[in-house]
From Swiss-Prot:
GO cellular component: membrane
Keyword Coiled coil part of the UniProt annotation: no
Subcellular location: Membrane
The keyword Transmembrane helix is annotated on this UniProt entry: yes
Known glycosylation sites: N59, N117, N123
Name used for this protein in its record: Butyrophilin-like protein 10
Cysteine-cysteine disulfides: C54-C128
Residues of the signal peptide: 1-29
Length: 275
């Protein structure tokens, strides 16, 4: 009679356990999944719409899953999609009526929430969670909001004792823009700039002042740019001031504004008193 080896008795139980585990993981392919978000920050423009996309790492369906987008903490809900429909009960007041779900590719594990009419206050971190039964995974997204400000306006006045004063104003920027004054030779001109933030919109307005010397009054350029946007996208905003003070009491402001590839020209007259 052949003797049974002690280890042989455990082989059937090991085989059964292995088959059971295989059945658990291969039933619908979703028992162990990973959610991915964009690898880089997303850029959104104030007043426009922006999607926050997330997807499963494997090409498997997210149908039947609960999909949730929130801000810094789970209770700060941006949008929830559950049981095939949008759920608004938990949504933050700030996002009421401003979000929509894009599930056109949910069958292949992709979904997105669109934020409509982006504001400065949408800037920051987001999280998306895909949940099925007790399994869930989440990804983090970063949204950078940029505000394109208005074309700069230049006003020139004669301050009597301090000579000519040029003011460059603009509003609607985010974050704080960069302001640069140049003379006609392309040399920088020292300026005093002030920024203010609107409590209601979070957008930045600016007032930049120069008191040009005689060598600079032939012309000035005030340039304003957004640090988040390339020149070719935001446009280069400039206003050129030409002042004639050689014994005359009047002059012309020639204003040229270049924005998004277009040139706008206007002129107006002003009076200065020349000693």
């Amino acid at each position: 009679m052949a003797r049974a080896h002690p280890g042989d008795a455990t082989l059937p139980s090991i085989l059964v356990s292995f088959i059971f585990l295989q059945l658990l993981t291969s039933g619908n392919g979703k028992s162990d999944f990973l959610v991915l978000g964009p690898p880089h920050p997303l850029l959104a423009i104030v007043g426009q719409d922006k999607e926050l996309p997330c997807k499963l790492s494997l090409n498997i369906s997210a149908e039947g899953m609960e999909l949730r987008w929130y801000r810094d903490k789970p209770s700060s809900v941006v949008h929830v999609y559950k049981n095939g429909e949008d759920v608004y009960d938990e949504q933050m007041v700030e996002y009421k009526g401003r979000t929509s779900f894009n599930g056109s590719h949910v069958a292949r594990g992709e979904a997105a929430v669109k934020i409509h009419n982006v504001t400065v206050f949408d800037n920051g971190t987001y999280h998306c969670v895909f949940k099925e039964y007790t399994s869930h995974s989440q990804a983090t997204l970063w949204l950078k909001v940029a505000g394109r400000g208005s074309s700069p306006r230049i006003r020139v006045t004669d301050t009597q004792d301090k000579g000519i004063r040029a003011e460059c104003t603009s509003a609607g920027w985010y974050p704080e823009p960069k302001v640069e004054w140049l003379d006609l030779k392309g040399q920088p001109v020292s300026a005093e700039s002030h920024f203010s933030v609107s409590a209601s919109t979070g957008l930045v307005a600016l007032l930049s002042i120069v008191t040009p010397q005689d060598t600079a009054v032939g012309g000035l350029t005030c340039s304003i740019s957004n640090p988040l946007l390339p020149e070719k996208d935001t446009g280069f905003l400039a206003a050129v001031v030409k002042v004639s003070v050689s014994g005359a009491h009047t002059g012309n402001i020639g204003q040229s504004v270049q924005s998004h590839g277009s040139i706008i020209k206007s002129s107006e007259s002003f009076s200065v008193k020349v000693p």
